[in-house]
């Protein structure tokens, strides 16, 4: 099965910080054409962090279009080998991961036994994968950050 194409989704161009070009998280990249794509996608000047970015929706062709990041207002990154997945939510839609198709996707990932760190603006939350112990690295990280784990 082939990968999804980004198409008009440019959410990673907004949410993700890009230190190489001093782009803060939550602001549009100057090379992004919102709703159209990255203006330098195939250019050698494209920042390395962008080249290395792993969007779960793009790389999971079995996920339906309703879970495309620009539709659910967050992206999920990480690979099968990742200890946990990152869920990065557009700060303009802080509840997106808790309602509608966004919640469906979070529940699907959790029920598959995957741990998630959810980032919403300056807030971070941990969601424990179903029937999986919490890794010590996550416990230590959350204690350092002073956050409480969300355990359902």
Residue map of PLM features:
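Short loop/turn segments that flank or connect secondary-structure elements
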Residues: 1-152
